[in-house]
C-alpha cells in the first residue's frame, strides 16, 4: 500500500508539473531595471515573419536587461496545444492585457472570437500605448457577413476607415513597395528628428532583409524617425534600385497619437521591419527597445546606448509561410522560446 501511495504521489506530481509547464503563453518575470513593476504583453500571430521567434527574443531582452515582466501570446492550435501561426482564430491569454502597460502587436489577418478580441479593443479604448510591427497594419480581417461588434477593426473597413491599422497605427495595408523576398530595405534616419531621444545610440542607417512596404496615409502630426529605401537585392551591400522607385522612400518607423473609438487618445509606434532575421541588426533592436521605454514613461531615462544583447541563443528562421503539417511536426510550444537553463 505504501509503495502504491508513493507511485500515485509521483504520478500526480508529474501531472501537476506538466500542467504548470503547459500554459499556452510564455511569462518571463523581470529583473531589476527601468521597467520594474511594469508589464509588456506581446501578441503574435502571422504566417510569414516568425513573429513567435522575434517577439520572444524581445521579451527576454526587456525582462532580463530592463526589468519588465513580459508575457508572449501565440497562435495556438487547440487540437495539439502547439504553436501554429496559420490558426487565425485562437490566441490564448489576451486577458493579460487588462494589466498591461504596453501591448506589442505583431499579427496578420486574425479573426478572433469576440471573447478574445474584446481584450484588445478594451486595451486600445483605454488609450494605452501600442507597438505595431510589419503586417500589423492589417492585423484583423472579418468576412463581409460577419456579425461581430468588432468588424470595423477589419483592415479594409469603410465604417472606421482602414480599421485598426489606419486609425491606431497610421495606415492600413496597401502593397509591397519593394519586391517581396527579392529586395531588402536600407532605412535612413529622418535628419529633422536626429535629436529625438528614442534615437539615442541608434545609427543613421539600418539594414533589413524585409522589403519596403507602401505607407501613404500618415499625417503631419505623425513623427517619422526613419524612411525606407528599396535595395536591388537582399544584401546590405546591394545598391539601391535604379527604376522609378529610386527617389522614393517610405516611412519605416514612426510615432502616432491616436484617438480610440472611445474618444480617448494614446500613442503608438510602428515599424515596417519585422522578419526574425531583421532583428539581428543591433541598431534596429535598440530602436525598438528605446521606443518601448519611451511608451512606458521612461523617455528621459533612455540610456546613451541601451543594452540590447541577446539573452541566450537567437537563431532566426527564414521568412515564408509554412504548412499546417510543418507547424504540427515542429511541436513548438510557448515554453520552446523561454529562457534556457545553463
Language model features: what each stretch is:
Residues 25, 63, 69, 88, ...:
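Catalytic beta-strand/loop cores that center a nucleophilic Ser/Cys/Thr
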Residues 6-18:
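Bacterial N-terminal signal peptides
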Residues 105, 110-201:
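A glycine-rich, often tryptophan-bearing local segment used as a flexible ligand/cofactor-contacting loop or short
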Amino acid at each position: 500500500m505504501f509503495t502504491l501511495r508513493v507511485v500515485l504521489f509521483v504520478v500526480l506530481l508529474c501531472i501537476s508539473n506538466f500542467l504548470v509547464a503547459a500554459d499556452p503563453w510564455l511569462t518571463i518575470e523581470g529583473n531589476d531595471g527601468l521597467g520594474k513593476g511594469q508589464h509588456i504583453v506581446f501578441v503574435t500571430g502571422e504566417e510569414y515573419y516568425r513573429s513567435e521567434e522575434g517577439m520572444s527574443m524581445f521579451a527576454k531582452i526587456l525582462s532580463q536587461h530592463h526589468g519588465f515582466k513580459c508575457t508572449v501570446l501565440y497562435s495556438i492550435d487547440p487540437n495539439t496545444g502547439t504553436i501554429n501561426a496559420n490558426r487565425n482564430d485562437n490566441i490564448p491569454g489576451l486577458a493579460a492585457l487588462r494589466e498591461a502597460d504596453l501591448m506589442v502587436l505583431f499579427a496578420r489577418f486574425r479573426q478572433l472570437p469576440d471573447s478574445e478580441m474584446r481584450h484588445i479593443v478594451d486595451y486600445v479604448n483605454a488609450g494605452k500605448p501600442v507597438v505595431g510591427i510589419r503586417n500589423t497594419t492589417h492585423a484583423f480581417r472579418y468576412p463581409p457577413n460577419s456579425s461581430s461588434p468588432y468588424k470595423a477593426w477589419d483592415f479594409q473597413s469603410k465604417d472606421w476607415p482602414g480599421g485598426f491599422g489606419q486609425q491606431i497605427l497610421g495606415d492600413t495595408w496597401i502593397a509591397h513597395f519593394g519586391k517581396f523576398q527579392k529586395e531588402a530595405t536600407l532605412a535612413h534616419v529622418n535628419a529633422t528628428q536626429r535629436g529625438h531621444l528614442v534615437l539615442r545610440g541608434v545609427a543613421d542607417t539600418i539594414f533589413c532583409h524585409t522589403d519596403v512596404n507602401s505607407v501613404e496615409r500618415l499625417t503631419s502630426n505623425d513623427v517619422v524617425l526613419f524612411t525606407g529605401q528599396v535595395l536591388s537585392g537582399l544584401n546590405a551591400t546591394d545598391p539601391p534600385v535604379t527604376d522609378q522607385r529610386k527617389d522614393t522612400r517610405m516611412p519605416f518607423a514612426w510615432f502616432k497619437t491616436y484617438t480610440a473609438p472611445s474618444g480617448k487618445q494614446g500613442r503608438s509606434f510602428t515599424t515596417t521591419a519585422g522578419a526574425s532575421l531583421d532583428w539581428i541588426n543591433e541598431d534596429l533592436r535598440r530602436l525598438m527597445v528605446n521606443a518601448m521605454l519611451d511608451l512606458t514613461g521612461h523617455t528621459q531615462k533612455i540610456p546613451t546606448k541601451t543594452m540590447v544583447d541577446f539573452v541566450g541563443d537567437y537563431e532566426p528562421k527564414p521568412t515564408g509561410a509554412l504548412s499546417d503539417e510543418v507547424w504540427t511536426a515542429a511541436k513548438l510550444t510557448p515554453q520552446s522560446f523561454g529562457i534556457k537553463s545553463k
